[in-house]
Amino acid sequence: MNPSPNTQHPTPSSLPYREGRGGSFIFETRMEVRDYECDIEGIVNNANYLHYIEHTRHLFLRSLGASFADMHQKGVDAVVARMNLQYKIPLRCDDEFISRLALRKEGIRYIFHQDLYRASDEQLCFRAKVELVCLVNGRLAESSEYDEIFKKYIEE
């Protein structure tokens, strides 16, 4: 998914910490709803919210100097194991929204709490809990590489 032209990519350290459901948000980016993402009712089709939060995770990783493609070349793939989604207030065509992310680790799972807020009034539109696990050379395993990348955010 391509970001809209006005998408901003702050570094995690430049983001003021803000409490979210899953802890402090450590990353945010802005995006805009495009007309083709909406259904006949004029609201964002439910599947597009998954694109928004996935794109946010990719931008977050890139802001830390890594990428899913680079990790794949090393034989390490972070894959979604489970999602819990809550649709709150629909986004509509041309709405600008803020995607915020918090992260913690439980066992071998990386837990991302991701919220989408309508920029005009900070109304919560969508909330997700996304659990990722790593496949190292095709097998479920701990990833020392991802632990290193995320260490600032997952150390207790």
Name each region found by the language model.
Residues 46, 69, 142:
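Short, electropositive, low-hydrophobicity segments enriched in small/polar residues
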